């Protein structure tokens, strides 16, 4: 889904087209800074209403602010301007999840499979939407099969959601914690994010907070999924 490239080129390639239209670098901007960004982008959109990059960037800013319906609206406009990008737009699928539009989320992640068939994260978000729409067993029964995702610990994350793995195996695969290593930090950020989301699907609130907090704080990353962890952490603590 283009969120993390460790030893593999496919994932980076899948979002290259979106990035060309202005997928911004995502940091830990404060709420006032994000609101200023939205104001600036809105002015640019007023001046040039057919600028796809500005809609994409504002959609990301709205998502980070927790304004998910507005985020989806901007992503929709981006796709209207560039229809060929719809299968690539996993960001809209994640926004659907947080906006409780689970059926649309399922559809988006099934569409993304057509351009990125071996992405564990896509399979997981499809599972999460399906679990909310129906139940965990239905989500597990329709879990998108993945031939191979080389990113550590994605194999173990897929096994967790499939029912044959465990959170402990995910963390073991992530390896020893090395605070001085960006790769170690990244692996543990993703491990805790997806363990937290797994517990959310199972309704285990305390474990959700534990793992999402670790992904958002101790192992925070300045990338899109690091931002998702921070947004989720804010939602469950307010």
Name each region found by the language model.
Residues 44, 77-78, 111-112, 215:
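Canonical positions in the second alpha-helix
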């Amino acid at each position: 889904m283009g969120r993390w490239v460790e030893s593999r080129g496919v994932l980076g390639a899948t979002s290259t087209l979106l990035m060309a239209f202005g997928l911004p670098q995502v940091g830990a901007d404060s709420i006032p800074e994000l609101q200023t960004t939205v104001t600036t982008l809105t002015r640019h959109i007023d001046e040039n209403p057919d600028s796809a990059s500005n809609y994409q960037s504002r959609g990301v800013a709205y998502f980070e602010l927790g304004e998910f319906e507005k985020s989806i609206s901007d992503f929709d406009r981006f796709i209207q301007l560039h229809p060929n990008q719809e299968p690539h737009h996993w960001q809209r699928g994640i926004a659907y999840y947080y906006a409780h539009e689970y059926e649309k989320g399922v559809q988006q992640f099934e569409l993304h499979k057509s351009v990125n068939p071996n992405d564990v994260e896509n399979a997981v978000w499809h599972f999460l939407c399906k679990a909310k729409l129906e139940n965990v067993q239905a989500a597990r029964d329709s879990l998108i099969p993945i031939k191979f995702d080389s990113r550590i610990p994605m194999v173990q994350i897929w096994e967790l959601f499939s029912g044959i793995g465990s959170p402990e195996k995910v963390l073991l695969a992530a390896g020893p914690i090395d605070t001085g290593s960006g790769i170690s930090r990244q692996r543990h950020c993703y491990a805790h994010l997806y363990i937290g989301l797994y517990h959310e699907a199972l309704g285990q609130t305390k474990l959700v907070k534990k793992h999402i907090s670790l992904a958002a704080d101790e192992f925070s990353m300045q990338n899109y999924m690091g931002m998702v962890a921070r947004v989720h952490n804010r939602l469950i603590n307010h």
